[in-house]
Amino acid sequence: MAASVVCRAATAGAQVLLRARRSPALLRTPALRSTATFAQALQFVPETQVSLLDNGLRVASEQSSQPTCTVGVWIDVGSRFETEKNNGAGYFLEHLAFKGTKNRPGSALEKEVESMGAHLNAYSTREHTAYYIKALSKDLPKAVELLGDIVQNCSLEDSQIEKERDVILREMQENDASMRDVVFNYLHATAFQGTPLAQAVEGPSENVRKLSRADLTEYLSTHYKAPRMVLAAAGGVEHQQLLDLAQKHLGGIPWTYAEDAVPTLTPCRFTGSEIRHRDDALPFAHVAIAVEGPGWASPDNVALQVANAIIGHYDCTYGGGVHLSSPLASGAVANKLCQSFQTFSICYAETGLLGAHFVCDRMKIDDMMFVLQGQWMRLCTSATESEVARGKNILRNALVSHLDGTTPVCEDIGRSLLTYGRRIPLAEWESRIAEVDASVVREICSKYIYDQCPAVAGYGPIEQLPDYNRIRSGMFWLRF
């Protein structure tokens, strides 16, 4: 009996293949394909739906079959919108958001979140602020209600402000122990000196000690406006339900400004410069070097991300040794140049930072800087098709793996609508990546890196960090 079943199955399969040979179109149907290309697979990614409330607040969602969801409010405000006087106000408000609202004391807010088994979080950057909740899909109505209450009705009680002031000051002391965070704050301070982007998200400790309830109230009334907000959700959510909940709980957020005092985004200039903080008591030197990169909307971003993928990243705990695909990584292993390095591309509205950060022994700083700049110059002058193909595949993998889960997808939706005005589909990103070849990488790298003045930040035992003029001379090659 079993043999006859197998025989009939084989006969049926042969008949299908025979029909496919006669009609090649059959081979293009998903049922007869064993695999789909990367570009074809991206066509089946769920669509992002976007709607607009009457007050200008945008509502966006991506529905999937997951039993959980992440929903959050992304706001177009960060430390670059602050002044020297109120720098740190946004970070302060982020902390106060969990301490209760006018409708819910802090203990009641915590109990409601815990009773759902949900996770409530928030973060601030130089351009954006976000509040989000990850919960079961059935708890979406309660999650949106809580977010609406947090964004609109923060209690700002004097006792909570004083208590949180001490918490933030302790956090700032802990952050100072993170050498990487310190170096990147130094890098922004020197690269964008004299502009709002130089300001740290946390603000200076003097401001944290002086910020008052009136300062925080003014910050809220100035920046928390509906047209600058996005309610984003991902996972097991229905867009119409989300839209109805947004109208109910966020539809009352104001959209007008007193006396038309609309905040404007101050353009930030890049300055090639350096900042050095020498501390020989520390075991390793942390150094960051960057040139001015493009803003969010620039078409050059994809080619520069491919270039960063070619240079790659490295940590001494990695396996592979000298067989790593990145020439800089294999060289770092062979010559014991560093403990770790990573490339980065930090984008803002109209500018950015494109560079690398490395951690190394005090006697290897000069060598590591020389090799890193040599790799930059090689990309500008002689990037090859094979390494560009490798960089494109690395970027494709990062693009997809970054969106694994409802929280990363929700964050991508919220940030994309604030920066691009829309969510760029993965298929469109793939087409942009596919257009990059070696000539494009050489051209774009030459535009942003070759013979450009860098910003440099060093922290730790950095006596051997080369003089700025030497570093600047490493940004070009004499060619005949």
From Swiss-Prot:
Gene3D superfamilies: Metalloenzyme, LuxS/M16 peptidase-like. GO terms for molecular function: metal ion binding; protein-containing complex binding; ubiquinol-cytochrome-c reductase activity; ubiquitin protein ligase binding. Keywords: Acetylation, Disease variant, Electron transport, Membrane, Mitochondrion, Mitochondrion inner membrane, Neuropathy, Parkinsonism, Phosphoprotein, Respiratory chain, Transit peptide, Transport. Residues 1-34 form a transit peptide. GO terms for biological process: aerobic respiration; cellular respiration; mitochondrial electron transport, ubiquinol to cytochrome c; oxidative phosphorylation; response to activity; response to alkaloid. Its main location: mitochondrion. This is Cytochrome b-c1 complex subunit 1, mitochondrial. Expressed in brain, including substantia nigra, striatum, cortex and cerebellum, and in spinal cord, heart, kidney, liver and muscle. The keyword Cytoplasm does not apply. The modification N6-acetyllysine is found at residues 111, 138, 163, 248. Component of the ubiquinol-cytochrome c oxidoreductase, a multisubunit transmembrane complex that is part of the mitochondrial electron transport chain which drives oxidative phosphorylation. The modification Phosphoserine is found at residue 212. GO terms for cellular component: mitochondrial inner membrane; mitochondrion; respiratory chain complex; respiratory chain complex III. The keyword S-adenosyl-L-methionine does not apply. Component of the ubiquinol-cytochrome c oxidoreductase (cytochrome b-c1 complex, complex III, CIII), a multisubunit enzyme composed of 11 subunits. The complex is composed of 3 respiratory subunits cytochrome b, cytochrome c1 and Rieske protein UQCRFS1, 2 core protein subunits UQCRC1/QCR1 and UQCRC2/QCR2, and 6 low-molecular weight protein subunits UQCRH/QCR6, UQCRB/QCR7, UQCRQ/QCR8, UQCR10/QCR9, UQCR11/QCR10 and subunit 9, the cleavage product of Rieske protein UQCRFS1. It is a peripheral membrane protein. It comes from Homo sapiens (Human).
